[in-house]
Design a protein with these regions (language model features):
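Conserved metal-binding segment of the jelly-roll/cupin
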Residues: 1-9, 15
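Structured loops at beta-to-helix junctions and adjacent beta-edge loops in soluble globular domains
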Residues: 5-7, 24-28, 70-72
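Eukaryote-biased feature marking scaffold/signaling PDZ-domain proteins and nuclear chromatin regulators
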Residues: 7, 18-20, 62
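Short helix/loop capping segments that flank catalytic or ligand/cofactor-binding pockets
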Residues: 12-13, 34
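A short hydrophobic beta-strand segment most commonly corresponding to one strand
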Residues: 18-33
Length: 435
């Protein structure tokens, strides 16, 4: 006979012969007397506190560490209060040690989701062939469903992780044993597989590395976290220089440092409003200089679209007039050819909201007129990248352009009208100019 506690890990194999009897008991402690006490882990806690406090000094550790747990937990039950056996004992040591060493500690679910191509192994019946894993084409390693040590939920989005962050290094040695679901070939698709593995884990990092950890998770993780930090800082009185302001500023700096580099991700950040979100966050933190630097590097020097204009106009209102006009000129010079409508709207916003005095807008307005798409021999060659080709002006955008030019300098407006009328192939009289 063999007996197990229900929450102990054990393996049950198919019966080769005979029968299996299962007797299930609920064990309840009765009677008076002192409750059993957990062992004293004071020495281990002291040692762990010292190791965590030396995290930054070692120089060899990643920004976060992941300690997978022994027992299985579902999304519904995961929580520090629900930990069992060795996991509860580990939490008893980790919680005070992390607090003493100024580390953030979370409980999360660790998931590995892999898909790819499967190969026939040559075994099995022709009606029920056997497969084996061939090539992994997609792999996602994420941490999600976060819980704090006080039992509260965290709204932090999923974070990616790597094997180098696991402690111990072989903690996921049983990943290869995870159940694999194979799908037979259909049509033009070959045989495929999907493997899903999930386990609970402690996740911790030094509090002063929080910004780097969140920024590494991508804009979908870091920007919501930044907005939450700023919201809490503003609710606490918005005192510039206090701990909340410094924490939000550190995260904003980390986001700037890890801004996407791939051109398609940069465009996605602009069209998705994430560039505008960061500019807005920097302005709320009174980091006008940082917002201007980001705009020069990532907007004028990267991707730009109409979604950026409200934040850019707000930035121009906070800058010195000459600096605002110069920044506006940089954006228009870089993007007037491909985004003429967005540039006209930004110019109109700055004029209407008084962000820049009208005399100072003459330079940016002239740059916009010079940068408009042209069908003449001096016209810039259309980029091979389709996403960077000129966006045709709409009738409303054209009306906005002429209106703002009239307000800035009537002579510029006359030049614009003459320019447009002379290029009917680009600026159709019936669909654009007459309306």
């Amino acid at each position: 006979f063999a007996a197990f506690y229900a929450d102990c890990r054990h393996e049950v194999l198919p019966i080769a012969s005979g029968y299996r009897l299962a007797l299930i008991y609920n064990l309840i402690r009765v009677g008076e007397g002192p409750l059993p006490q957990a062992p004293d882990y004071g020495d281990q806690q002291t040692q762990l506190t010292r190791l965590l406090a030396d995290w930054d000094r070692s120089g060899s550790l990643p920004d976060k560490l992941i300690y997978p747990l022994e027992h299985a937990y579902t999304e519904a039950e995961i929580g520090f209060a629900a930990l069992k056996g060795q996991d509860a004992a580990a939490a008893q040591v980790l919680i005070p040690a992390a607090a003493a060493a100024s580390c953030d500690l979370y409980l999360a679910l660790l998931s590995v989701n892999e898909t790819g191509w499967a190969e026939y192994s040559g075994g099995g019946h022709w009606r029920d062939p056997e497969f084996e894993i061939g090539e992994v084409s997609y792999s996602a390693w994420t941490l999600h469903d976060w819980r704090r040590a006080d039992g509260s939920l965290s709204e932090m989005a999923a974070l990616p992780f790597t094997e180098e962050e696991l402690s111990p290094a072989e903690a996921l040695a049983d990943l290869e044993d995870a159940e694999v679901e194979f799908s037979e070939a259909t049509g033009n698709e070959g045989a495929s597989f999907e493997r899903f593995y999930q386990r609970a884990a402690f996740v911790l990092w030094p509090s002063d590395r929080r910004g780097a950890v969140l920024a590494a998770g991508g804009l979908g993780v870091s920007l919501p976290a930044l907005r939450d930090l700023i919201r809490r800082w503003e609710a606490a009185g918005a005192t510039e220089g206090d701990a909340g302001w410094r924490e939000a500023g550190q995260l904003a700096s980390a986001i700037r440092a890890q801004w996407p580099q791939a051109s398609w991700l940069v465009r996605q950040a602009s069209s998705g409003g994430q560039s505008a979100d960061l500019i807005d966050a920097l302005l709320r933190l009174n980091d006008v200089e940082g917002a201007a630097e980001f705009t020069t590097e990532r907007v004028a020097g990267g991707a730009y679209g109409p979604e950026d204009n409200p934040a850019l106009a707000a930035l121009c209102r906070r800058l010195a007039p000459e600096a605002a006009a110069g920044l506006l000129g940089q954006i228009i010079t870089a993007h007037a050819f491909c985004r003429p409508g967005a540039c006209a709207n930004l110019l109109a916003r700055c004029a209407a909201e008084g962000a820049i005095a009208l005399p100072l807008l003459q330079g940016p307005a002239q740059l916009l007129l010079q940068g408009l798409p042209d069908d003449g021999p001096a016209s810039p060659t259309a980029p091979q990248d389709y996403s960077q080709r000129p966006e045709p002006l709409t009738a409303l955008q054209l009306a906005e352009l002429i209106t703002v030019l009239v307000g800035i300098d009537a002579a510029l407006a006359d030049q614009a009208v003459s320019f447009l009328l002379a290029r009917p192939a680009l600026y159709d009289m019936d669909s654009l100019l007459v309306p």
